[in-house]
């Protein structure tokens, strides 16, 4: 055993032993309780960041603790390898996305291995490999057969210069990110999945999940179940009588409708724009810019009157029709009723364009004014109808019932349940993704690729140039024969949304070599007992994966309908930011490692200078580590300098897993010092720790009893903290243990060996390398086996027993000292000890005790 702790040597030795033993390969075992813990698989962007380190360490700690407690544990890893960043990198570097992706995977895998993670690499999944995405294609075809997948037109962002479809994030201020051209909205055929078919189940099943309430609320709101009324405004055009249909949750305000707004893509808009150049110009303007709902929600609301009116369904009054840029054809009916008096968006729109505002609900004690919007204007819990004829005085529920009944009687509408959730459009007009297994035949139309011909393999040697989809230019990929009639045909060039890849990978981990999509091993491991990932995935990924599980269940592939029993959303890793701003307002960000910060006498930062030139930089505050703010810390540099165990220890100690973690160089130094102390104690006491003599706990001297009492008391708390995933307090417990062991005077070698062994096991899940090596070189492995599967230490309850206890001593209710008494001391003995204590004499100032209050096991209060 070396005197000095050298992390690189210790970690290399431990990892060598683990590789030789194939230590983390997991197998199904029906006789053991399983625990399947999964970190959300990373995108292979090039190198790990500290968010990855934190996520995977949390997973690893969980795995190791539960394995020591007898669970059959599994921690796999894979790569979410398709996606747009690879195409962008390919364009920038002139290499195929496949080359960039596989190089990144190789480097990031080395980094994970350097962290000492308990990953079963035999189960590695890479989503851009045909043996994985074959099953995306296979399930898509099964869903197509069942009507769960279908084709319809959808709206996309079209760059007219690059002749390509853009993702929402590639549209900047309404222009294409590369060409700068104004982006157009286009309707193109796309494939969708009927996630709406599962809306109620997705909502109801949230109740049974051990997920953060915040995530469940976000999914609940995203699904957005609404109870309302779907009805039509009658109109006549070109000799035909029709209805302009809308859906509303506020039918109680129908008498306040003063306009209707329709989407630019609404069929009525196109008809009304004939021979009206100004109207057509506005429609064209609306079709430019992004199609993201978030963009539309925040942009300026604009509209143009069409000069056409529909009839109010209850009064017959004319209602003017407008085209509004805020109305989405993909939501509801592509038309909305405008009630300016009681909808904030409609209120602003009406004020902007001088439209009538008609109050039709009131709240007692409130006065309505059109001068400015007030929150109560939209209140449906306290409001009653006014200025609404026969509906006056009705509260929300009664008004909706009555109005819906009248609309139904007139054949104009009825109550309806709707969802904010829309079917999942999976078609992407991109190269680097799962090919959609469809063949376009001029005679047979769209023909599914036969199952025996799967996978449709994506060529990996193409290099995107930003002008259209490379697959459409690849004759080798594009040209094929129709499987129905044998005619010359073309392959579908759209690929699948990358959320398809991540919707089920955890099921493939369970059976990575299966010749079917999944097999019996999947039902052994799934659902995941613990899923770990960032809150940013709360909606789309987690919702799609839940939907995918339910589809797989309904197709008879798996027995479960929810992929993850429990979810932990780890907090972000934060760091300081520093910048300089030029005359044009452009900021240049500097990495904290390149900056020297000065502090005031209270330790608060008051200034900073760049090390390279000594000139000031601005303090930008604490923010999430990111490339844009240049405030990241390279995990590889941390591992190279301090070792993986120090990086792991700091990330677990600095904050509870679900909370934000503020980076601290001093904290990293502190973690390193602590591990050196653990090693130093083992080295200094290596001979005493090698003693394996049994001992009678009852016959120990007081020093031994005291040390065992402290260690087992802390162990009890640490075990509890491991179970509730509070790893920061586990590390605190280990620090208390080391302090107690270092400070123990007179404890026998056998007691030191026992208590130091407890410390190593408590620390092991957090810092596996150094504890594994100390366990081995100090002979613990010879007694208990390797630390990988050493049994978790049991709390010796007898050791917690104390002959004496300490009570708080109060005089007239104020704490004046402490009183040691026998554990089984009688009330009389405690009272006698209290009045005989020197602190009582000091503060009683000669006055006799009038009353003595004893709270057993806690305090004694002497009243004078």
Swiss-Prot record:
It is found in: Cytoplasm. A motif ('KMSKS' region) lies at residues 624-628. Its main location: cytoplasm. A motif ('HIGH' region) lies at residues 42-52. ATP binds at residue 627. Keywords: Aminoacyl-tRNA synthetase, ATP-binding, Cytoplasm, Ligase, Nucleotide-binding, Protein biosynthesis. It catalyses: tRNA(Leu) + L-leucine + ATP = L-leucyl-tRNA(Leu) + AMP + diphosphate. One of its GO terms (cellular component) is cytosol. One of its GO terms (biological process) is leucyl-tRNA aminoacylation. Its EC number is 6.1.1.4. Transmembrane segments: none annotated. Pfam families: Anticodon_1, tRNA-synt_1, tRNA-synt_1_2, tRNA-synt_1g. InterPro entries: aa-tRNA-synth_I_CS, aa-tRNA-synth_Ia, Leu-tRNA-ligase, Leu_tRNA-synth_edit, M/V/L/I-tRNA-synth_anticd-bd, Methionyl/Leucyl_tRNA_Synth, Rossmann-like_a/b/a_fold, tRNAsynth_Ia_anticodon-bd. Gene3D superfamilies: 2.20.28.290, 3.10.20.590, HUPs, Isoleucyl-tRNA Synthetase, Domain 1, Valyl/Leucyl/Isoleucyl-tRNA synthetase, editing domain. Belongs to the class-I aminoacyl-tRNA synthetase family. HAMAP family: Leu_tRNA_synth_B. This is Leucine--tRNA ligase. The gene is leuS.
